[in-house]
C-alpha cells in the first residue's frame, strides 16, 4: 500500500495532462494566459507550487505559478472560466483539492475547485483545450500528474536492522577433485573464481515520488555472517523501479594434500535467496537545496556465506 505524495510548497512541479501529455502554463505575454504546452519543451512558465490552505480551506491548495506569481482559478462565470490572478487566495475559486484517482488513475489526480466544484482538463482534440467541467462527470482528460523539478540524490540509507531473508537454499558453485594414484603425497591448490548474478530493485512505498527509471548510485545491501551489511565496494548505478543485474565474485585458494591412493574433493557452496531491506533516499532540489525523503523496500536475489567442504576418500 502506498500513499499519494503531495509536495510541500518548497518543491515546484509541472502539471502533466494524462490524455494530452501537455503541461499547464501560466504566462502574461500570450493569450490564453493559462494554457498548455508539449511536455518535452520545458520552460519556466510551466512550473507551479502548492500552497496549503487553513481554516475553511484546509485540505485545499493554491496552485501558484513560479513564473508569474499568480494563482489559478476555476469558475462558472464570468469568462474566462479558467485563468490566473494576483493574490493569496482571497477568492474561493482560487482553491483546489488534489483528488487522487482510482483504478488506472491511482498515480494521477483531478484538480477540484472549492467554490465552483469544477475540475480542470487538458486536451488537444477539441476546443477549448484547457478549461473546466463539473466535477460530477469524470473523464480521462481531467487527470494530471506531477513532474517534479530536478532533484539530486544526496544519500541512500538502508535500515539494516529491519532487513529480512525471505528464502534461502544452498547451491554448489564449485566442485573440484584431486585423485592420487601414486605412492607419494600429492599437493595442489584448488582455485575458485566464480561470479554469481544478483538481481534487485528499489520499490517505492511513501514520500517523494522519484521518477520511474531515474538513475542514482548506492552501495548494495548483503548478508554476511547472518547480518545485513552494506557493501560499498559494489557501489552500483541503479534505475529506480526497474530490475538491475550485477555480479558478485567469489575468489578463494585452497591448498590440499592427497595421501597415496586417495581422492580429495573440495566443494564450495553459498546460500542463495530473496532478501528485502527498507531504505530511505534523501534528495534535495538542485535549485534551492530543499530536502525531501523517499521511503521504500530494496528487494533482491542475493548470495552469501561462502563455505568449503574438503573430504578424503580411499581409492579401491
Predicted regions and their residues:
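Lectin-like carbohydrate-binding module/patch detector with strong preference for beta-trefoil
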Residues: 1-155
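Membrane-permeabilization and membrane-interfacing ectodomains
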Residues: 149-316
Amino acid at each position: 500500500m502506498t500513499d499519494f505524495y503531495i509536495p510541500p510548497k518548497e518543491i515546484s512541479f509541472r502539471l502533466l495532462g494524462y490524455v494530452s501529455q501537455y503541461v499547464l502554463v501560466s504566462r502574461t505575454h500570450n493569450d490564453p494566459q493559462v494554457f498548455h504546452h508539449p511536455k518535452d519543451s520545458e520552460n519556466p512558465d510551466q512550473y507551479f507550487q502548492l500552497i496549503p490552505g487553513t481554516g475553511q480551506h484546509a485540505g485545499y491548495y493554491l496552485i501558484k505559478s513560479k513564473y508569474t506569481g499568480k494563482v489559478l482559478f476555476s469558475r462558472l462565470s464570468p469568462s474566462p472560466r479558467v485563468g490566473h490572478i494576483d493574490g493569496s487566495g482571497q477568492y474561493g475559486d482560487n482553491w483546489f483539492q488534489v483528488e487522487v484517482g482510482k483504478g488506472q488513475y491511482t498515480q494521477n489526480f483531478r484538480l477540484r475547485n472549492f467554490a465552483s466544484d469544477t475540475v480542470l482538463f487538458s486536451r488537444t482534440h477539441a476546443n477549448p483545450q484547457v478549461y473546466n467541467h463539473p466535477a460530477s462527470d469524470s473523464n480521462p482528460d481531467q487527470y494530471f500528474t506531477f513532474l517534479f523539478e530536478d532533484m539530486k540524490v544526496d544519500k541512500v540509507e538502508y535500515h539494516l536492522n529491519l532487513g529480512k531473508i525471505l528464502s534461502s537454499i544452498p547451491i554448489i558453485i564449485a566442485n573440484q577433485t584431486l585423485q592420487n594414484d601414486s605412492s607419494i603425497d600429492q599437493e595442489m591448490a584448488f582455485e575458485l573464481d566464480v561470479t554469481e548474478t544478483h538481481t534487485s530493485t528499489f520499490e517505492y512505498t511513501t514520500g517523494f515520488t522519484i521518477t520511474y527509471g531515474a538513475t542514482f548510485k548506492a552501495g548494495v545491501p548483503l548478508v554476511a555472517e547472518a547480518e545485513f551489511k552494506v557493501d560499498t565496494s559494489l557501489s552500483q548505478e541503479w534505475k529506480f523501479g526497474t530490475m538491475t543485474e550485477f555480479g558478485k565474485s567469489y575468489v578463494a585458494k585452497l591448498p590440499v594434500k592427497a595421501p597415496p591412493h586417495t581422492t580429495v574433493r573440495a566443494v564450495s557452496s553459498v546460500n542463495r535467496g530473496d532478501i528485502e531491506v527498507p531504505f530511505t533516499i534523501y534528495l534535495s532540489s538542485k535549485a534551492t537545496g530543499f530536502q525531501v525523503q523517499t521511503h521504500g523496500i530494496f528487494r533482491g536475489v542475493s548470495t552469501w556465506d561462502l563455505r568449503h567442504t574438503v573430504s578424503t576418500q580411499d581409492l579401491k
